[in-house]
């Protein structure tokens, strides 16, 4: 099956807001259940409708405003209330999915990171937990309470480790290995592997913002990266984002808030450094999406307490003003560029010279054979070709593009904007990926200002 053929999924609930394009192979095939099949939970009454394959309305007062349903391979989850209530709803509604998600990491950690899951749980307790704000501590505890109400034995440190997996395994672990004089596992490096753009003004068909993002990950993770979280917190902005079961931020990242901020990112390549006294990235990215009402506010929240974990190039648009921004968030350098006319592309390359020097010293901008630079070249060519006409349809074409700019041919592989690492006979050396690595683009999402306005 050609994974690059995208299936456009438009839930009637999401229709007014977001166009979600999913690679045909990303969603589990019928008859191929996950480790913990999403069977109806105890007490759930299904209510079928054209828009909803199942609807959960539960008697517990903490769950009165919560529900979920499945559509087109996605699970739509509505959470509403105090941090404790939002967390409880999350844990209760997605208990089986969270169990399954944690299981993936407990299996892969010893192989990829050469450390048992218990190592990450201990780091979650000692390194991350002390720096998480009370609001999000309460939400995380709520997830555990919801899990326990469904009979799960997962504990708080499982959930913190799940939320912090990327920053612990790819940023914290290398610093510990260096300190202990241990070799760093090939897989324990800052990941790359996402493609995105944001455009506005004369670059787009209607002069408004268009944003697009594809999530590249292992297929073990990607099969589970199928949540759409609709969160109405007691304080802050109403937010809509994709995500993973048990994780309080998008982590993908793709979302919008009711103030009109449109947000995504791609990971900075080979980022180094981790501040154990900083605020976890998963909290900062959630807080920024929930509370920021402008690009400057968003950047300020992401910069405050920056621990260097999960260092990303953030693409942010403000629907209210039409302004877009590019925030490279390294540990030592965090340059912010804004414009009201033009575009930014992102494909896991570093742009700022000081950031390359201090934060991503392993990145070689002149290695055009690498995935990140080859995609950068193709992304720029796509923007120039379609400048002035960019809309959601062209955004989908961008995410499904298969051109290899290095070999000058159509080839669905590691160098195409829509990634197929599993078809590539040459692994991506800078990420330590072997040939035919089982990973690639697993989801694609596009949005424009008009969609964002209807949240």
What function would you assign to each model-found segment?
Residues 196:
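Aromatic- and glycine-enriched pocket-lining scaffold segments that form the walls
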Residues 34-44, 48-193, 202-206, 220, ...:
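C-terminus-biased signal that marks the final domain/tail of proteins
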Residues 1-13:
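Bacterial N-terminal signal peptides that target proteins for export
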Residues 199-295, 300, 342-349, 353, ...:
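Active-site rim segments in enzyme catalytic domains, especially the processed small/beta chain
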Residues 15, 207, 260, 321-322:
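Detector for glycine-centered tight turns/loop "hinges" at secondary-structure junctions
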Residues 24-31:
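Boundary at the C-terminal end of the N-terminal hydrophobic targeting segment
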Residues 11-21:
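Bacterial N-terminal signal peptides
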């Amino acid at each position: 099956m050609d994974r690059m053929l995208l299936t456009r999924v438009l839930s009637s609930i999401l229709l007014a807001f977001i166009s979600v394009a999913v690679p045909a192979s990303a969603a589990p095939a019928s008859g191929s259940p996950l480790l913990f099949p999403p069977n109806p939970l105890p007490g759930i009454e299904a209510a079928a409708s054209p828009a909803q394959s199942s609807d959960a309305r539960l008697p517990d007062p903490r769950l009165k405003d919560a529900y979920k349903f499945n559509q087109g391979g996605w699970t739509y989850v509505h959470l509403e209330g105090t941090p404790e209530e939002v967390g409880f709803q999350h844990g209760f509604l997605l208990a089986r999915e969270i169990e399954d998600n944690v299981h993936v990491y407990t299996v892969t950690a010893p192989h990829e990171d050469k450390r048992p899951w218990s190592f990450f749980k201990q780091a979650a307790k000692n390194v991350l937990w002390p720096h998480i704000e009370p609001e999000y501590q309460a939400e995380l505890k709520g997830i555990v309470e919801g899990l326990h109400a469904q009979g799960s034995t997962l504990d708080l440190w499982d959930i913190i480790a799940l939320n912090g997996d990327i920053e612990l395994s790819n940023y914290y672990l290398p610093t510990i290995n260096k300190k202990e004089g241990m070799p760093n596992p090939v897989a324990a490096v800052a990941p790359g592997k996402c493609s995105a753009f944001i455009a506005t003004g004369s670059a787009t068909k209607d002069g408004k913002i268009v944003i697009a993002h594809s999530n590249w990950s292992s297929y073990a993770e990607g099969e589970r990266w199928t949540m759409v979280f609709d969160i109405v917190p007691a304080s802050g902005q109403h937010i809509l984002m994709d995500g993973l079961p048990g994780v309080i931020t998008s982590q993908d990242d793709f979302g919008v808030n009711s103030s009109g901020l449109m947000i995504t990112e791609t990971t900075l390549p080979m980022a180094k450094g981790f501040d154990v006294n900083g605020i976890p990235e998963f909290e900062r990215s959630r807080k920024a999406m929930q509370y920021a009402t402008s690009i400057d506010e968003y950047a300020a929240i992401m910069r405050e307490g920056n621990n260097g974990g999960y260092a990303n190039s953030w693409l942010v648009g403000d629907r209210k003003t039409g302004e877009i921004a590019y925030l490279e968030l390294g540990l030592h350098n965090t340059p912010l560029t804004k414009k009201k006319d033009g575009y930014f592309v992102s494909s896991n390359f570093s742009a700022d010279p000081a950031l390359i020097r201090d934060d991503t010293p392993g990145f070689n901008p002149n290695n055009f054979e690498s995935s990140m630079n080859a995609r950068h070249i193709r992304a720029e060519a796509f923007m120039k070709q379609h400048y002035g006409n960019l809309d959601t349809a062209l955004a989908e074409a961008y995410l499904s593009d298969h051109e290899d700019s290095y070999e000058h041919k159509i080839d669905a592989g590691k160098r195409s904007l829509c990634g197929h690492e599993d078809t590539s006979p040459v692994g991506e050396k800078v990420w330590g990926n072997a040939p035919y690595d089982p990973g690639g683009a697993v989801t694609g999402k596009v949005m424009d200002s008009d969609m964002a306005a209807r949240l």
